[in-house]
Regions:
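Helix N-cap / loop-to-helix initiation motif
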Residues: 1-3, 115-116
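Conserved catalytic cysteine-centered active-site region
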Residues: 5, 9-63, 96-103, 167-193
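Active-site-proximal alpha-helical scaffold in enzymes
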Residues: 39-70, 109, 113-139
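Flexible glycine-/small-residue-enriched beta->alpha junction loops
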Residues: 54, 58-111
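Short, well-ordered secondary-structure micro-motifs
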Residues: 17-18, 76-78, 157-161
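Short beta-strand segments at enzyme active-site cores
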Residues: 3-6, 67, 141-144
Length: 194
């Protein structure tokens, strides 16, 4: 019996809302008695879901728990200039410049100036090449779980990590925009993917 379901989603609105952990459990066909909850911890949400449930298993509170994260970027209400609650800003409960991991990464570059964009880009290209080689050498496949995914054209089985970009080059990295700051360091190429 599954004891709990923890699911992270950064923007808990629409079909990512409604306590996504509980909703996921019900839609997966788990018994109504299985609870579920949502975590919103920005980019670290899924990792928090895994560590929280693993800790509960470790202390004996759970025997079995499910953990994960969902982000459906097409469902995010972007472009509406939706600011945080003004009270948060006036009472300094939230730093508006620290609301996402992209700005956090830029601040790391500020703190460690030796971590240049060129070094970050080179690391990212190397990481992509290592991932592609590991996949080619069948080292990743044992850890991959096929997932059924629906689309407008029907259902298909996703069996491969879609985030690997073995064709990445340092030259290509130079052309990527820095969305968090003008002349920043962080791009879609050297940041952690969604």
């Amino acid at each position: 019996m599954i004891d709990d379901v923890a699911v992270a989603a950064t923007t808990q609105t629409g079909d990512q809302g409604l306590t996504i952990g509980r909703t996921s459990a019900i839609l997966a066909g788990l018994p109504q008695s299985v609870p579920g909850y949502a975590i919103d911890r920005m980019c670290a949400g899924a990792m928090t879901a895994v560590t929280t449930t693993a800790s509960a298993i470790g202390i004996g509170a759970y025997d079995i728990a499910l953990a994960g994260g969902v982000e459906h970027m097409g469902r995010h209400p972007m472009g509406f200039d939706a600011d945080p609650n003004p009270r948060f800003l006036s009472e300094k409960l939230v730093n508006p410049e620290a609301l996402n991991m992209g700005n956090t990464a830029e601040k790391i570059h500020d703190r460690y100036p030796q971590l240049t964009k060129e070094r970050a880009d080179a690391f990212a290209v190397g990481s992509q090449q290592k991932a592609a080689k590991a996949y080619q050498d069948n080292k990743i496949q044992p850890d991959l779980v096929p997932v059924s995914a629906g689309s407008e054209s029907g259902w298909s089985l996703v069996t491969k990590d879609e985030l690997m970009r073995p064709e990445s080059t340092l030259e290509g990295m130079k052309d990527l925009k820095t969305p968090f700051r003008p002349h920043g360091q962080v791009t879609a190429g050297n940041a952690s993917p969604l």
